[in-house]
Amino acid sequence: SDLDAHISLKPTAFGLTIDYDYALKTLSGIARKAHESNIYVRLDMEDSNHTESTLKIMEDLYSEGHLNIGVVLQGRLFRTKDDLKRIAEKMGQHADVRICKGIYLESSEIAYTSYSDIVSATSEAVETALDLGMYVGIASHDHPVINGALLNLQSRGILPEKPDPRKPAPLVKPGKGEGYEFQFLLGVRGDVRRRLASDGHLTRVYLPYGKQWYEYSMRRLRENPGIAWHVAKSVIMPWTNRR
């Protein structure tokens, strides 16, 4: 297919919490098959109980030779900067992360809990990832995070449709941009996404797929009611979110 699309998977859906070796074998097979079609596989991050095991399985997949593997990190967790350094050390120019705020409610002992602190921490995580030479998927609908990322990119000379000037820079992969991209949930902030795209930035839309797409979407709305208006607006007035 000529469709420029990648895959995001939740490792727990493939047995991560039941049988690690089985999950590794299954995800390895998926990564191998995806590679045949130049498809990138992203391991979604769930709550903090699964952070370490998700990172480990990503590292094990990379050690097996899968270079089309990346992970998601949540800006709100205190450990995220150390995790970024860990990934950069392990994967070098193949390091590829999606950074989001995180939707899971976490203890104040391990995570920031106020909106302002979460936004600041997420912006700092993006900055750290850029400084570590990673490919960064900036996955936020929050204007402060997006605007902060744009300033950080500009200050480092990382510009739309231009070669990444970082040394070393992340390796360019099929379907990827030069060092970064912006990512949005389907139906959320379509106006912002279109503006970024018109300015030359690579943007990507997260699209739920499969038999349980509706259940998944409803769960996301319960976990993050702040996006409910954007989704409802795109349903009632679909012309506001057209590409």
Question: Where in this protein do the model-derived segments appear?
Answer:
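Positively charged, amphipathic and often flexible ligand-engagement surfaces
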Residues: 1-243
